[in-house]
Design a protein with these regions (language model features):
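Short alpha-helical transmembrane segments in multi-pass integral membrane proteins
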Residues: 1-9, 67-134, 176-236, 289-354, ...
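N-terminal transmembrane alpha-helices
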Residues: 1-33, 47-62, 66, 91-98, ...
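Transmembrane helical elements of multi-pass membrane transporters/channels
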Residues: 7-26, 128, 139, 161-162, ...
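Helix-terminus/linker motif at the lipid-water interface of multi-pass membrane proteins
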Residues: 21-40, 109-116, 172-179, 240-273, ...
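Alpha-helical transmembrane segments of multipass membrane proteins
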Residues: 24-28, 107, 141-145, 167-172, ...
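Small-residue-rich hydrophobic transmembrane alpha-helices
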Residues: 39-99, 136-155, 250, 261-327, ...
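Short runs within selected transmembrane alpha-helices of multi-pass transporters and secretion channels
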Residues: 128-148, 155-166, 184-199, 279-282, ...
Length: 433
């Protein structure tokens, strides 16, 4: 039973680790161009597209939940229809971004407010990379399908392939053709479409029979379209709450000065390290939870829930011990600024609480997606966001940055707690005792 979970989780963890490398590679290349404005342009551009990735992540999550249920039922035609529907909607939204490029660019630059010397380079990077949004969102639909049919190896291979293509193309455009920011952007663009093309090829090679069973009439069916948009709409709004909390966390850190901002940015990496692994088990919850829920195998479904939380508790213990013992050393690896390192010691105890505060939210998110209980995810995120802002508003004047970290950890903890309290009612309403 654990092997089934690990078979999904481990490739997903590898994929999660490779995703940030696309932006990191760009930063490393421009970091050797001798102009700080190039670095700023890439940082701003990467942040814009990371937000797009995050906000439209519902295309992957909603697809994986519905596909895993259809897969568990043995409904190959249903799986095919879900895939094509997600793919068409993802490509459609992506093309809308391309068509609305001037408006999106204006809004993004107004929000980010880059300095005058950075602005033209940031616009150049944006104007090239925006053409990759259709491939990026189309790939979300494909990845949701692959997770739904219990195959996370394909997304892993595609992620690794994308990074290799990005490195080769960006280096070639910059050092062989003499390009600057535009070369780095083109490398990213080529990598995105290369990954999308590889994913389509692997889809045809391994799951061609699924695609042949697709019915365009069923894809456009009103009831199924409504279900798709209801589920994904809930996840979309839920994601906006997450974005709002993270934006507030970063913005409040910035208001406290450069040192506190640096401390919060570096300490947040501990949460990121934890999330890479926990997201892998969340994906396993989506895949195996949805499969056994769709198949109506209640005993297996409950068993998978227990095993997932067993892995979650084990990882909490390991991460907590690792952070307590090695947290200071990790901070010194992340920065050599003595002032930042000294300031971080005051807040390091909050890092130790990250695993136990956040574990349940990750596991429940995967399971809720698997059974398409998206409204529960939305409600838990709403309640948690309210708690975050209340704690921040009430305690920040007296507690300062400690209040900000308390609010963030409570946001994670409350999400998991609310989902725990709602779970029994939800599964009973779905016919699972």
């Amino acid at each position: 039973m654990n092997s089934e979970i690990l078979k999904i989780a481990i490739p997903s963890i590898v994929s999660n680790i490779t995703v940030p490398l696309l932006g990191l590679i760009d930063v490393v290349i421009v970091g050797h161009m001798g102009n700080a404005a190039y670095i700023g342009a890439i940082a701003i551009g990467s942040m814009i597209f990371n937000v797009i990735c995050w906000v439209f992540g519902f295309l992957r999550m909603g697809t994986s939940g519905m596909a895993s249920q259809a897969y568990g039922k043995g409904d190959d035609k249903g799986v095919a229809n879900i895939l094509v529907r997600a793919l068409l909607i993802g490509l459609g939204i992506g093309m809308l971004f391309v068509v609305m490029q001037p408006i999106v660019r204006w809004a993004a630059m107004a929000a980010m407010a880059p300095q005058a010397d950075v602005l033209p380079y940031a616009c150049t990077y944006f104007d090239i990379c925006i053409w990759g949004v259709p491939a990026m969102l189309g790939l979300y639909g494909l990845n949701g399908f692959f997770i739904g049919v219990q195959n996370t190896k394909v997304p892993m291979m595609v992620s690794i392939f994308q990074n290799v293509v990005n490195i080769v193309c960006s280096l070639s455009f910059v050092y062989l053709l003499g390009m600057k920011v535009e070369g780095v952007a083109l490398g990213t663009l080529v990598a995105q479409y290369s990954g999308f093309a590889l994913s389509l090829w692997l889809l045809k090679r391994q799951y061609g029979e699924y695609v042949k069973k697709c019915s365009l009439e069923a894809v456009k069916a009103k009831d199924e379209m409504k279900r798709f948009f209801v589920v994904n709409g809930d996840i979309f709004v839920r994601t906006l709450f997450l974005v709002a909390v993270n934006f507030m966390f970063t913005a409040t850190g910035a208001k406290q000065g450069a040192v506190v901002l640096a401390v919060n940015t570096l300490m947040y990496q501990f949460f990121t390290f934890f999330s890479y692994v926990m997201d892998g088990f969340a994906y396993a919850g989506e895949a195996v939870g949805g499969k056994y829920y769709g198949a109506g195998k209640e005993a297996m479904f409950r068993s998978k829930v227990r095993h997932l939380f067993g892995w979650g508790l084990l990882l909490c213990l390991l991460y907590t011990m690792f952070y307590i013992v090695c947290g200071g050393g990790i901070m010194q690896l992340l920065s050599d600024d003595a002032i930042v390192i000294a300031a971080s010691a005051t807040y390091m105890s909050w890092v130790w609480l990250i695993p136990f505060a956040g574990m349940a939210a990750f596991i429940w998110d995967g399971l809720y997606i698997g059974i398409t209980a998206s409204r529960g995810m939305l409600i838990s995120s709403l309640v948690a966001a309210v708690v975050f802002f209340l704690v921040y508003l009430c305690l920040f004047p007296s507690w300062g940055n400690h209040a900000l970290w308390l609010a963030l950890l409570l946001f994670l903890f409350v999400r998991g707690t609310v989902q725990t309290l709602m779970w029994r009612k939800i599964i009973r309403s779905r016919g699972i005792a």
